[in-house]
Amino acid sequence: MSDSDSSGGWGDVERHLRMYVIRHEKRPVDDPTFDVSLTAEGLQDAEEAVLDELNELGVNAVYSSPYRRVLQTVQPYLEQDHVGMGACVEWCLSEHPEPNDTPPTEIPDEFYEEFHIEETYTPFMTAEKAHRLNGDIEQVQSRLCDFVELLSRTHDDGDVVLLATHQTSVHALLSMASGIPIDCMDVPMGKVVELDWHGVLKYKYHGGPNPPWACYESHFIPNKRKGGGDLKWTYIEAGG
């Protein structure tokens, strides 16, 4: 069924809950710590390509890692008058592996002045618990599964939810949903990808898909154009 009716509007067509993930825009390659800012190019792309795509998708809920660079990525979208909301800062979307000598435990006061943040939002996971569940990729997958399940229960049909986070979390979510190994993925910075959240829940309760192919890094071919583009995968059959 088409998402829209023949008149170009949504009509009476039912719109299901959709979730998207975005990896933050470009940062300095040698500094993944909490307070590092996007590069000049990353800031510009956040104000142009990312902004345009989020407007096109009609995102109406944003959950963000507390890291400065992630909030910078979604800020141009959130500061628009028609959006009318802030980012829900969520510690379970934090960076992995831990890049800070001392893991952060609270949002700096200046972030509330610099970014549109929902001050009344209570995070699904405290900073302390997120840090405890940051030792390996299995812990990251577990905390992300639990969060996606919560979102699937608290959001309504028609909602368009964005999870703004980091490379490892983006790859972990897409891997759980698709069965494609994390090592085969290289989602570009600033890229928005739709998440099959049903697939994530199936992974949590029944284990992930078991695709009948061998996969190498070269199989994952991102295509990031100014207007977004598609993510494309190529596969080699097992034994081929």
What are the functions of these language-model segments?
Residues 17-22, 63, 158-169:
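Beta-strand elements within well-structured catalytic alpha/beta cores of enzymes
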Residues 28, 69-71, 95-97, 169-171:
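Short, active-site-adjacent cap segments at secondary-structure transitions
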Residues 36-37, 79-145, 186, 204-206, ...:
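Phosphate-handling substructures
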Residues 76, 80, 150, 154, ...:
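Active-site catalytic microenvironments for nucleophilic, acid-base chemistry
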